Amino acid sequence: MAKSPQQPVIQSILDDAYHKFENDTSGKNADYIPALAKVDSAYFGLAVVTPHGKIYTKGDVSQPFSIQSISKVFTLALAMEQKGPQTIVDKIGVNATGLAFNSVTAIELNKARSVNPLVNAGAIATVSLLDGKNEKAKWSALSAWYDKFANRKLSVLEDVYKSESDTNGHNRAIAELLTSYDRFYGDVDLNLAIYTRQCSVAVTTKDLAVMASVFANNGVHPLTDKRLMSSDNVSRVLAVMTTAGLYENSGQWAYQVGLPAKSGVGGGIIAVSPGKFAVAVFSPRLDSAGNSIRAQKAIDYIAEKLHANIF
């Protein structure tokens, strides 16, 4: 295992990152989901968790917000554990689309109708692959899986769920299109409801760092010492995060920062330095690709100072 940075160093770098970017007001909240548009854009929280279970925080790390697309990583992890990694390749795809996260064109352009599990089309299809005889059973298993990563019981932000359910016509169209190509593996209404619910799960910055630390520790939870995933599946999840975690900006992120990462339009980003640490940052203002601007800058700074680039 790679050596984790020392405690005083990590906390000092978190403090520096917070003060360096706390006055950055560039970007704006996601506005196509009304509940997200209302979130205070000034929130800024940073958290790091090491494979040894040490937790370092700065800023608004206890403020709940919706996990949004960061949930896709953990749903992918469960699907891999249940179905095996080759099923993901065969039934979803793992190549970057190079297009927006909610693109329909990505499906049409690929003759195999292959996308990846970290864009909306692939993520909704991944939900349809999960075990569960009905909506209640499938959601119960998925939410329990999230709880294991967070090491606590998580809940759904019902206002976000309602807001997204009322505005998810585009995702429904994606699911119907996938169904027409035999690339969707269950009832559209049922699986779209679960997907929308997973995106509405409430987390804090600290929660996300704890959840991502399982990937930094090769599938073993640093706080419980329990193995949640096989090491092979961890490697594959991190690979997809590297190529598609920040949507059409993923290549630039890999070039600049060099860490597997995943963003969400709620303002969170997680990044993983295998064997060293996981970092999560929350700041609601986004760039045009749907990635938090301050979170990107803060993680870039932290990764550089901790010499964490994996390439």
Swiss-Prot record:
Top enzyme category: hydrolase
Protein family membership: Belongs to the glutaminase family.
Protein name: Glutaminase
A GO term, aspect molecular function: glutaminase activity
Family matches, as Gene3D superfamilies: DD-peptidase/beta-lactamase superfamily
Subunit structure comment from the entry: Homotetramer.
Reactions catalysed, as given in the entry: L-glutamine + H2O = L-glutamate + NH4(+)
Amino acids binding substrate: 69, 120, 164, 171, 195, 247, 265
InterPro entries: Beta-lactam/transpept-like, Glutaminase
Gene Ontology BP, a term: glutamine catabolic process
The organism of origin for this protein: Colwellia psychrerythraea (strain 34H / ATCC BAA-681) (Vibrio psychroerythus)
Key words, A-Z: Hydrolase
EC numbers, comma separated: 3.5.1.2
PANTHER family noted in UniProt: GLUTAMINASE, GLUTAMINASE 1
